[in-house]
Structures are given as C-alpha cells and as structure tokens.
Amino acid sequence: MTQTQPVGTLRLTIDDQGPQGQSRAVEQFHQGALRVIRPHYLDDSGQVCYTIIAIGGGYLGGDVYEQQFTIKDNAKALITTQSATKIYRTPQGPATQHTEINVGENAVLEYLADQTIAYREATYHQFTKVALHPSATFVMSEQITPGWHPDGKHFAYDEMRLHTEITDSTTGRLVLLDNLLLRPDSREGSFGWTEQYTHSGQMIVMGEGVDKQLVAELNEQLAAHPDVYGAVNFLSAPGTLLRGFIARTLSNRTEELINLHEHIASLLRGRWRGQEPVNLRKY
C-alpha cells in the first residue's frame, strides 16, 4: 500500500467459526476517518454484513484511504457503505483509495458500495487488488455520479481513475487488469464516450457458476432495459480456473444502476447459494 499517512484505515478478517457456523470478524482494525457499523445478518445463511462509514464527510485533495478485507476459507461476507462517497475539489492532488481483498477457498464476498460522487475540479484514483481462490465467489459493483455544479454542467470533475487487478491466489496468474479512466475535459462533447448518459457503472463478478450462457442472458436483459445502456463481457485466462464477467453500464440516474447491480447480485446468490435477494435496508 501507499507510504503516505492515510486519513482512514480499515482492516477486516472474517472466518466461519461463529455460532452455528455464522461468519464473523476475527480481526477488526480501524483508524482515522473509516469505521464499520456493528455487523448484522440479512438472512439465515450465516453471511455477515458490514457497513463502512467514512466519518469525514467526503474525500479532499491529497487524502489517502486504505482498506484490507480477508475472507477466509468457507466464510461469507457482504460489505457495503452507509452512503455515497463524495469527492470534493482536490487542488492539493488527487484523493486516493487503496483496497486489498483476499477471498479464500469456497468463500464469498459481495462488495456492494454506494455511488461515488465526483464534484467540480475533483480528481480521484482508486486502486483495487483482489486475490481469489478458484472456488471463491466475488461480486463488486460501483457507480460514478457527477456532482452538482452551479452552472448545471454534468461533467465538472477533472479525472476519475478506477484501477482493478484480479489474480488467482493459488498460482499468481493475472485474470483481469482493468483501468477505467474518465477525463471529461479531454473529450469534445459526449459522442463516442457516454453519448447522452451522465452516470456510469461497472460490476465485476467471479465465480464457478459463470459461463458464456449466463453472460448472454445478462446481455439480453441489458438490451431490454429501457433506462440503462451497457454490455457484459466474459472473463477468463489461461493457466487458471477462475472465470467471471465485467459489466459496463450507463444511465441518467444513479438508482437505475444500483437497482440493476443489486438485481444481478440477487439473481446469482439465488441460483448459486439459494439465498434471498439483496436487501440492504438502508432507507
């Protein structure tokens, strides 16, 4: 991780040795502007749910945040946020978040964050490194929303960079290296970039249940969606059994992207583990 003193640090290690096989945190550390709410269980599957709170109110220029999540063999966790992550003006340099994730054998992590709102003259760099056992299930969704501007301008932020690496923890094999870079001022208009849309999203899913038939099914659902434009692509790599998909989505409303991502997460948890749909009970 970074050598700069972080504004907020959070570490969670989760195993499956709680009462009646429930997953639980065996290591929990927080410092500075990051906290977690007391864990709760959304159903009787034993999956533990943690909610992250950023108590500073928003990310500022030069801020660095660090997160580390370890899900041990057979454990199941859902990690979410209490509210949107807000990136304000960053004249001192980019706001940065580093996240390291390790998901063990037959373990599950659903990382379903609220939207990231980038305001005028904001630069945000996010680096996420994920190591997965081939039998693990990993779901991550993100939404990027342009913040309010007094002139009504939609894309007033300077830069958003979301860098994601996924590797096979048993072989070290790289499965995904994704670098989503949004620089509105480098584009003349929206044609060929976001077209008429203002909000963007991405969802990454890795799991043994992913195949090309599932990807085709999700693409059909996306094509029929009246308010979201996007595509789903299959992920695999030689030298590893890991496989998954990445979905890129565009819309004009944050809620449409969040609802779509939660629909996909609910569809997969029902098929793969017989769990109820996602219900984060935030509002």
From Swiss-Prot:
Source organism of this protein record: Corynebacterium glutamicum (strain ATCC 13032 / DSM 20300 / JCM 1318 / BCRC 11384 / CCUG 27702 / LMG 3730 / NBRC 12168 / NCIMB 10025 / NRRL B-2784 / 534)
Function: Probably acts in the maturation of urease via the functional incorporation of the urease nickel metallocenter. Required for urease expression.
GO CC annotation, single: cytoplasm
Annotated knockout phenotype: Cells are urease negative and are no longer able to transport urea.
GO molecular function terms noted in the UniProt entry: nickel cation binding
Disulfide bonds: none
Keyword line: Chaperone, Cytoplasm, Nickel insertion
Protein name: Urease accessory protein UreD
